[in-house]
A protein has these predicted regions:
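N-terminal (or domain-start) structured segment
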Residues: 17-91
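Extracytoplasmic
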Residues: 19, 60-62, 72-75, 82, ...
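Pocket-lining segment of extracytoplasmic ligand-binding domains
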Residues: 92-94, 102-104, 130-132, 168-263, ...
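Ligand-binding clefts/hinges and TM-proximal coupling segments of bilobed small-molecule sensing domains
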Residues: 143-160, 235-304
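Bacterial N-terminal signal peptides
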Residues: 1-10
Length: 322
C-alpha cells in the first residue's frame, strides 16, 4: 500500500478524490493491538460511503486504512516519527517517554507526538509454565525467560521491571527475544520457562498458553519494587487479572499495568485524525463489540486516561461533537 501524509490545505482536484492510503501500526497478529488497529479501520470504512472507497460525506478525499502486524509500541512510534505510519497503537508509558525524551527515547525526543485516544487496560503479565514452579519474580532466577523483541512495549516494560528489581539479563539462565506471536509456542514447546507481556484480557494467545502442555498461568508481581514503579509514574497503576479469566487460573493475579493508546503526529492532517476519531465515536457500541477487552470502555475516559502527549486538534474536534 502507498503510505500518504495528508495536507488538506492543497487545492482539491479530481486526482485528490481517488483513494489515499494510511497506516495504523499495531502489534503481533495474536495480540489486542492488531485487533485494535483493524477495529479502527473497520469503523472508518463503516462510516464511509462504500461506493466512494472510504470518502466521508462533505470531504473531497477518500481514505483507505490498513493496520498491519508490527513490532509493537516503540516501533510504531518510531515509524510515525519517520513519517512511515500515520497512526500507531502504543502503551501509555512509551507514549510518555517518547514525547518527553526519557528512558529509551532520551536523545531522540518526539515532541510532535500527539494523542488520539486511549483504549483498554493492559496489565503487564509474566506467564510461567506449571513445570517451572515459578510463583513470583524472585523465582525467575536461573530460568529461561523471553524478554520480548527489541522495539516492543513488552521488552521496554520488562526492562523497566528488571531495573526496579535490581537485576539484569544475567539473573536468568538465558533470555530470548521472541515476538509476542512466537513466545506462546516456545512456552508450550518447553523451550522457555516464562515470558513477559503487556496485553488486555481475555486474550486468545494467553488462553492457548493456559491450555497447552505447559499449563501456564500468570504470576503475581507485587512488593516494594513494583509499588515503587506505580508510585513513581502516572502511567502505571495496580492491575488484577481475576481468577477464572483463563483455564486453570485458580487465583487472582495481581500486577501493574498501562493503557493501550492510539497516537499520531502533529504533521498528520486535522481532517484525517478527525475522521478516524469520529468513526470510532459514532460507532462506539460496534467498536466495543470488536474485542472483549473493549467492553468496559467509556468515551469520557478515552480522552484523558493514559494520555501524556497533547491531544491532536482533529481528535479534539471529534470529541466536541461526540
Amino acid at each position: 500500500a502507498v503510505l500518504v501524509t495528508f495536507a488538506l490545505s492543497s487545492p482539491i482536484t479530481s486526482i485528490a478524490k481517488s483513494a489515499e492510503f494510511f497506516t495504523i501500526g499495531t502489534g503481533g497478529p495474536t495480540g489486542v493491538y492488531f485487533q485494535t488497529g483493524n477495529a479502527i479501520c473497520k469503523m472508518l470504512h463503516k462510516s464511509a460511503i462504500s461506493a466512494d472507497h472510504g470518502r466521508k460525506k462533505g470531504t473531497a478525499k477518500a481514505y483507505r486504512c490498513t493496520a498491519p502486524s508490527t513490532g509493537g509500541s516503540n516501533y510504531n512510534i518510531g515509524q510515525i516519527k519517520d513519517g512511515e505510519f500515520q497512526f500507531g497503537v502504543a502503551q501509555s508509558d512509551w507514549q510518555y517517554h517518547a514525547v518527553n525524551g526519557t528512558s529509551k527515547w532520551e536523545g531522540n525526543q518526539f515532541s510532535n507526538l500527539r494523542a488520539v485516544f486511549s483504549v483498554h487496560n493492559e496489565p503487564f503479565q509474566i506467564w510461567a509454565s506449571k513445570k517451572s514452579k515459578i510463583k513470583d519474580f524472585k523465582s525467575l532466577k536461573g530460568k529461561v525467560v523471553n524478554i520480548g523483541n527489541p522495539g516492543s512495549g513488552q521488552r521496554g516494560t520488562m526492562e523497566e521491571l528488571m531495573k526496579a528489581m535490581g537485576v539484569d539479563n544475567s539473573y536468568f539462565k538465558s533470555v530470548t527475544e521472541l515476538t509476542s506471536s512466537e513466545q506462546v509456542k516456545a512456552l508450550c514447546d518447553g523451550k522457555i520457562d516464562a515470558f513477559g507481556y503487556s496485553v488486555g484480557f481475555p486474550n486468545g494467545a494467553m488462553e492457548q498458553a493456559a491450555t497447552c502442555k505447559a499449563k501456564a498461568s500468570p504470576i503475581n508481581l507485587t512488593g516494594a519494587p513494583v509499588q515503587g514503579l506505580i508510585s513513581g509514574a502516572d502511567y502505571y497503576a495496580k492491575a488484577v487479572i481475576p481468577k477464572g479469566t483463563y483455564s486453570n487460573q485458580k487465583k487472582d493475579a495481581t500486577t501493574f499495568g498501562v493503557k493501550a493508546t492510539v497516537v499520531t503526529s502533529a504533521d498528520v492532517s486535522e481532517e484525517l485524525v478527525y475522521l478516524v476519531t469520529k468513526a470510532v465515536m459514532d460507532n462506539f457500541d460496534d467498536f466495543k463489540a470488536q474485542h472483549p477487552a473493549f467492553g468496559f470502555l467509556k468515551k469520557e475516559d478515552m480522552i484523558k486516561a493514559g494520555l501524556s502527549a497533547p491531544l491532536h486538534p482533529g481528535a479534539i474536534k471529534a470529541y466536541k461533537e461526540a
